[in-house]
A protein has these predicted regions:
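Active-site microenvironment for binding and transforming phosphate-containing groups
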Residues: 1-255
Length: 255
């Protein structure tokens, strides 16, 4: 099966920017990791993960690029990458650069991958944004880091890739209290109640954060939980009694 990925038409239209939100197809892994598992922290053999990551890079024609990733920790920590940067997996959840040939990557399996690009300044970014990073301000941290190397807020476009959506994202009462206390603005519109159960709308919350950061936001509308044939999902695997799960990769690079 071929490597497949989703794209934003807005990001695709920006010169010199290549990007992809990858599905789980086209890799070499098997079982619950079938098949393009790109998570080195999983129990999948590392050789499989390395091959899968290489296939993702190659699918975008970025074989000559250097791949950067993170030890994702649900934070607002963002790193600025240049030619002197090491490709060690530093703890954090965001990467930005203005250098060519630096492929920035994040992993997801329900948490949102968000890819950023300034339409004229040649600045890009990639963020991993679960609910903790979202309410703590990962979007604004990304925007500030991009602007520090030449981007302008009015020219930044952010695209939310495959992530868990509201109908699949049941949360507990204590989550609602944390959401309200950490957000600093009214959050009722992002919660839906049905039969004494609460459901959180992570993509809409991220779009609101984009709006508050004065950048353009877009959601591809891809539910990782629901689209079982296309994406890995931590929550879906948990509900199926599985203790492990694969991770899909999202990439962006200046060429």
């Amino acid at each position: 099966m071929e490597v497949k990925y989703k794209q934003s038409s807005e990001l695709t239209a920006i010169p010199r920017v290549k990007h992809g939100f990858f599905t789980k197809s086209g890799g070499v892994s098997s079982g619950i990791y079938d098949s393009l598992n790109c998570g080195p922290a999983s129990a999948d053999p590392l050789d499989n993960v390395i091959e899968n990551r290489w296939r993702a890079i190659a699918a975008l024609g970025l074989q000559e690029s250097q791949l950067f990733g993170l030890n994702q920790i649900h934070s607002t920590k963002v790193y600025t990458i240049d030619k002197k940067s090491s490709d060690d997996y530093h703890p954090g959840d965001g990467l930005v650069t203005r250098e060519k040939g630096m492929a920035l990557s994040v992993l997801g399996a329900d948490c949102a991958p968000v890819l950023f690009a300034d339409k004229s300044a040649g600045v890009i970014g990639a963020a991993h944004s679960g609910w903790k990073g979202s309410v703590s301000g990962i979007i604004e941290s990304m925007v500030e880091s991009m602007c520090a190397i030449g981007a302008n807020r009015e020219n930044i476009h952010a695209c939310i890739g495959p992530t868990i959506h509201q109908k699949s994202y049941e949360v507990r009462d204590d989550f609602l209290l944390q959401l309200q206390s950490l957000s600093g603005f009214a959050t009722e519109q992002f919660i839906k109640e049905e039969q004494d159960k609460f459901y959180f709308d992570l993509p809409s919350y991220l779009l609101e954060q984009c709006k508050r950061s004065q950048i353009q936001g877009e959601n591809l509308g891809l539910d990782t939980y629901e689209l079982e044939d296309e994406f890995f999902s931590f929550r879906r695997n948990t509900h199926q009694g599985l203790k492990e799960y694969g991770r899909q990769i999202s990439l962006i690079c200046l060429t």
